């Protein structure tokens, strides 16, 4: 790492500690050339995979778009913003855990439905009706019956 004081290339690490609940490493460094000390913070670069849409196009993961879709389904439902944010964090964590550079949008849609089902069954049905393109009342009934038969997966 370059010294921010003299620009030399050679610095040494004097001390390293975990900070931010283990999410960052704080390093105390010293320049070999000028002797000045400085602190750096290191964090892992956590990149979310790109999405492969049903038509084959690819686009970057858009957290705001995901949040807006979930908020639309949860509109006027008794679910706190904290619970919504926790569900979003869980989806992002699961996407990172795949280790893939790209995932099908279908996978994300299923993750959203699973999270909404845990949050609020009415919101789940709302989202499912749009996501699965329900055409008539029979499709709503089938989904509601399935919801009643199968417990939500934690």
Swiss-Prot record:
Functional summary from the UniProt entry: Negatively regulates transcription of bacterial ribonucleotide reductase nrd genes and operons by binding to NrdR-boxes.
Listed GO MF terms: ATP binding; DNA binding; zinc ion binding
Keywords in alphabetical order: ATP-binding, DNA-binding, Metal-binding, Nucleotide-binding, Repressor, Transcription, Transcription regulation, Zinc, Zinc-finger
Organism: Pseudomonas entomophila (strain L48)
Superkingdom of origin organism: Bacteria
Domain ATP-cone: residue ranges: 49-139
Residues spanning the membrane: none
InterPro entries listed in its UniProt record: ATP-cone_dom (IPR005144), NrdR-like_N (IPR055173), RNR_NrdR-like (IPR003796)
Name of encoding gene: nrdR
UniProt-recorded name of the protein: Transcriptional repressor NrdR
HAMAP family per the UniProt record, alphabetical: NrdR
Cofactor(s) required, per the database record: Zn(2+)
Family note: Belongs to the NrdR family.
Alphabetical list of PANTHER family matching this protein: TRANSCRIPTIONAL REPRESSOR NRDR
Cofactor binding, note field: Binds 1 zinc ion.
Start and end residues, zinc fingers (unnamed): 3-34
One BP annotation, GO: negative regulation of DNA-templated transcription
Keyword presence, Metal-binding: yes
């Amino acid at each position: 790492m370059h010294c921010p004081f003299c620009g030399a290339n050679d610095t040494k690490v004097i001390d390293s500690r975990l900070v931010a609940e283990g999410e960052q490493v704080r390093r105390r460094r010293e320049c070999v050339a000028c002797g000045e000390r400085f602190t750096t913070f290191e964090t892992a670069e956590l990149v979310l995979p790109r999405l492969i849409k049903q038509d084959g196009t690819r686009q970057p993961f858009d957290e705001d778009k995901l949040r807006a879709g979930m908020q639309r389904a949860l509109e006027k439902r008794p679910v706190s913003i904290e619970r919504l944010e926790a569900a979003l964090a869980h989806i992002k964590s699961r996407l990172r855990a795949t280790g893939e550079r790209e995932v099908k949008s279908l996978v994300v849609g299923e993750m959203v439905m699973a999270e909404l089902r845990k949050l609020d069954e009415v919101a789940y049905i709302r989202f499912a009706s749009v996501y699965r393109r329900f055409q008539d009342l029979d499709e709503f009934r089938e989904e509601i019956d399935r919801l009643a038969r199968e417990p939500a997966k934690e």
